[in-house]
Amino acid sequence: MRHKIKGRKLNVTSSHRKAMLANMAVSLVTHEQIKTTLPKAKELRPYIEVLVTKAKDNNLAARRNILSKIKDKKAIEKLIDVLGVRYKDRPGGYTRIVKAGFRYGDLAPIAYIEFVDRDINAKGNIPQDNSKEDIKSNKGTK
């Protein structure tokens, strides 16, 4: 029986799982939305919620505690300066998981995990203000 056993193994070693959660947390902080499997998203949610709650304090001890979990300095800066300020009045529930069907190769359940009230432009793939005429005129030139 699995009584009092917290977390999912995700079929990887503990060091791999720790590194994977840290990398996924950096990606989620950077892009504010990522696509992954449903069990990984469910495992990432409490991991990132704790980091955002610590980022709301914005003191040296909280910064060092976050640094022990994730190693990317730019992600830590965004976590404290942007997300900590954005969710200052929210007592929890900073992320949502949206199911997105099944993966083609192995039918693994896929989900998006994203921040609530996220910045739409943070994803980085928003098209520019190029009109169709500009694209057609630049097509022949190199």
Curated annotation (Swiss-Prot):
Annotated SUPFAM superfamilies: Prokaryotic ribosomal protein L17 (SSF64263)
Family to which the UniProt record says this protein belongs: Belongs to the bacterial ribosomal protein bL17 family.
Description of how the protein assembles with itself and partners: Part of the 50S ribosomal subunit. Contacts protein L32.
Cellular component, GO, one term: cytosolic large ribosomal subunit
Keywords noted in UniProt: Ribonucleoprotein, Ribosomal protein
GO biological process entries: translation
HAMAP family: Ribosomal_bL17
MF annotations from Gene Ontology: structural constituent of ribosome
The name this protein goes by in its record: Large ribosomal subunit protein bL17
InterPro entries with a match to the protein in the record: Ribosomal_bL17, Ribosomal_bL17_CS, Ribosomal_bL17_sf
